[in-house]
Amino acid sequence: MEIIDRFTNLEYGKVRYSITGEASDNLVVLMHGLTTSKDIYNNLTQNLIEQEFQVLSFDFYGRGKSDYVPNVDSENLYVNQAMELIEKFIPTGAKRNINLIGYSAGGSIASMVADRLENCASLILIASTGVPQIPTSPVLISLLQTFESNGEISSELKHEVEKQMVQELEVLEENETKDLALKVYNDLDIWNEKTIDTVKNHLLSTGGYVGDKSMNSIFESIGKKNIPTFIMAGSNDNWVSPESGKEIHKLIEGSLFFEFEDVTHWAFLEKPEVYHRKILTFLKSA
C-alpha cells in the first residue's frame, strides 16, 4: 500500500503526516528521532499494515516538511503536537488500542505521550533518550558542547560530523535502507540555520545529555500504569548509550529489554528483519 503524505494545520503550524492501512482498532503511532523525519519509518510502516495495523506517522515541528517553530524551550511542544494529531483520528468516546513507537529523541516524547493517554496499549522504545548519558563519540560530544555554550559550529567540526555520518552509513548493508537513510539526511539539510536551531533547542529543552530535566517520574508512572513496554538498544550505538536503555528498563517496572550486539544507532535500518520481527511479536502480544 502506498504511503500518502498529507498536511494538516495544528496549533503551531502545518504538519506533514500519513495514516496508512485499513481502519483498525489497533493504531500504531511512529515518532522519529532528533535529526530524522517520518520517512525513516517507511519500511516499518509497510510491515505493520501487512499485519493489519493502521499506522500514523508524522514530522515533528522543524523536521521533514513540518513547519519550523523558533525558540523551543520544552519537549512539551512535541508532546502536544503528537496528542493533537492523535486526537484528530480518534473520535470522542471511541476505544482504539494506541501503540506508540519512539526512536532516539522520539522515545522520550513517546514516553510522555504514553503517560498522558488514557488508552495506551503499548510502548516501544528504540535507542531512546530520556536519562542522562554521554555519547561515546568525541565528535558528538564536541557538537553538544558547542550547542550548550551557544557557540558557532566550526567548519572543522561540521566536517567531522559529516565524516562520522558517512562512516555510520557503511554499516547499512541493504541498498534500500541505505538509500532511505541518505534521503532522510539529504532532505534534512543539516547545516541549515533553522535545522541547527531546531536540533539545538530540542536538545537544550531536555537538559541536554546531562539531563538537567529528569524524566524519571514519567518512566516510573508508565510502570505503575502497567503499560506494556519494550526497550531496545544497540551495543555499538555512538549517539545514545545502551546504558540508557538499561536505566529506563529499571525505571519502568515490568518492561522488557533487549540489547542487540554490534548494532549502531541506525537500529531498525541496520537490522530491519530482526527489529521488525521483534516489534510485530511484541505488538501482537501486548
Where are these regions (language model features)?
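Alpha/beta-hydrolase fold catalytic core
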Residues: 1-29, 50-53, 90-91, 121, ...
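Conserved HGGG/HGGXW glycine-rich cap/lid loop of the alpha/beta-hydrolase fold
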Residues: 19-67
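Flexible "cap/lid" loop of the alpha/beta hydrolase fold
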Residues: 115, 123-155
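Short beta-strand/loop motif that positions the catalytic acidic residue
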Residues: 225, 231-233
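Catalytic histidine-centered segment of alpha/beta-hydrolase-like enzymes
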Residues: 239, 260-272, 276
